[in-house]
């Protein structure tokens, strides 16, 4: 049975290179369209592709063409309606098309350019220039991550690892070394035999001796094997520790009674955005989801986003659980630890100072970054005030306010924007 192997880099899509060139050339217009599309999407649609529209004027390229002046007379091939000298009527019709432009007496127009972005292209543009702040390499404690690398060749191994080229080179060198002396002496004997045969009365004993020598040398050359086991060379591969930066992100969300459905929807959108960003850009990262009201608990992703459990508000319960999990599973010397918290800022007044104490004395010294978003269109409360004091003490503590859905993406980019050197 025949088997087709397609080694084309574009996987059969001939326009892939042109598409990538187009995305690079009009990146600013496409990114603007992507940003506008984000605010119109629901949670379940956030990671899908997008139909992008670019105004025709933005993709205009200079080109050579005939000037409007001058005079030219010609009849195109295949014409059976006009002869030289006829005047062609202007096309009838109204304004020019394209982006609702003003009316034109030319009867011509140009539509906006519309094309589809794939999911991968959409996310690539969506999360460009973002990163986990201050990601540093920690010691590789208890990390069993290895990669196999080439380490030259060896004289022993399994058949699958035979290096054919090196083996044939080795065999060629061995054959040359072993057969060359016999080939040289064979050539000399054949020349001497030819010389004796040209004599009038050659010595038959000498002729017989030379013929035996020639036969001996030929047998010696034939006994040199084409390839021997000592010629075989095998690719040598070794496993080496693979340096990897591992990180853990804690997602903490307030689900108390003061968080109405609109606020919860904003918080869910923010964390889904964060989740997509982390899973796309980092292979070695773990996510821990913590929901809290008067009590906190660690939950899975499904329960974190869609559970309807509610209650009062004690933020310190989430911070205590956060600290407990870090101490039990994520030693700071081996993990880069990040926390993102979303709340409406409504907290039991007596609990806010304790939250400040937990952050300053226990949690912040262990973290790389803490991002707090408060979904509060009205005045801030005690939790925001104590968090501001934490921010003054720790530069790796960031705070932002979100009023509505439209603020999610700008705030997200501000919290996780890539630092330029």
UniProtKB/Swiss-Prot annotation:
Compositionally biased residues, Gly residues: 92-101
Instruction: Enumerate the InterPro entries for this protein.
Output: UPF0229, vWFA_dom_sf
| Residue ranges, annotated region (Disordered) | 83-110
Task: Give the matching SUPFAM superfamilies.
Answer: vWA-like (SSF53300)
Pfam hit, one: DUF444
Q: Which family does it belong to?
A: Belongs to the UPF0229 family.
Q: What is this protein called?
A: UPF0229 protein lpp2857
Naturally occurring in which organism (per UniProt): Legionella pneumophila (strain Paris)
Lineage of source species: Bacteria, Pseudomonadati, Pseudomonadota, Gammaproteobacteria, Legionellales
